[in-house]
């Protein structure tokens, strides 16, 4: 029963939030005018910056939750590393985006926020869910995103950022997969 209500609530939040998400992407502070330097970034580059920022916020929020909820020292150590590393990358991404006249998101996407809410409701099995969803799945998505950007983004500075950040994300993914094996073995 609770899961059914959760699904309905998440579905409603996604449906009703779509319109506000679109409005949030318009530059209201400048009276609807897009700064001239933003016009230099093509939609693919802006999309990469948006997705990368949201991904980082997802991983940081999930990792902060893991620090609070997990009893597993290895999970907490991984979570702290994710917070530290993603905070640095997030600052670099924000500075780069702003230098291009683009304001990156300051929080995860609505869908990612729903995933975080569902993760936060878990007590039993939290560690496995965190490692699976934030450690492995989110990093697989991030690696794909940065690999694509490192090949296809036209802006040379944004492309370089993707190239330089990719090895760290690949290391995070490998560490998450190793942790996943350990956590899965302990949960059996």
PLM regions: where:
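His/Met- and acidic-residue-enriched segments that coordinate or traffic transition-metal cofactors
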Residues: 2-12, 16-188
């Amino acid at each position: 029963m609770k899961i059914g209500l959760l699904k309905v609530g998440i579905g409603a939040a996604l449906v009703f939030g779509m319109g506000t998400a679109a409005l949030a992407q318009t530059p209201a502070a400048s009276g609807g005018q897009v700064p001239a330097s933003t016009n230099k970034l093509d939609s693919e580059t802006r999309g990469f910056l948006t997705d990368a920022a949201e991904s980082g916020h997802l991983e940081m929020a999930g990792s902060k939750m893991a620090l609070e909820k997990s009893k597993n020292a290895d999970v907490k150590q991984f979570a702290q590393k994710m917070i530290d590393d993603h905070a640095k990358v997030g600052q670099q991404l924000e500075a780069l985006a702003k230098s291009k006249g683009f304001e990156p998101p300051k929080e995860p996407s609505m869908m990612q926020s729903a995933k975080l809410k569902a993760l936060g409701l878990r007590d039993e099995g939290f560690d496995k869910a965190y490692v699976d969803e934030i450690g492995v799945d989110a990093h697989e998505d991030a690696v794909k995103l940065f690999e694509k950007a490192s090949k296809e983004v036209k802006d040379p500075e944004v492309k370089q950022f993707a190239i330089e950040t990719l090895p760290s994300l690949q290391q995070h993914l490998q560490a998450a997969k190793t942790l996943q094996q350990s956590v899965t073995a302990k949960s059996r």
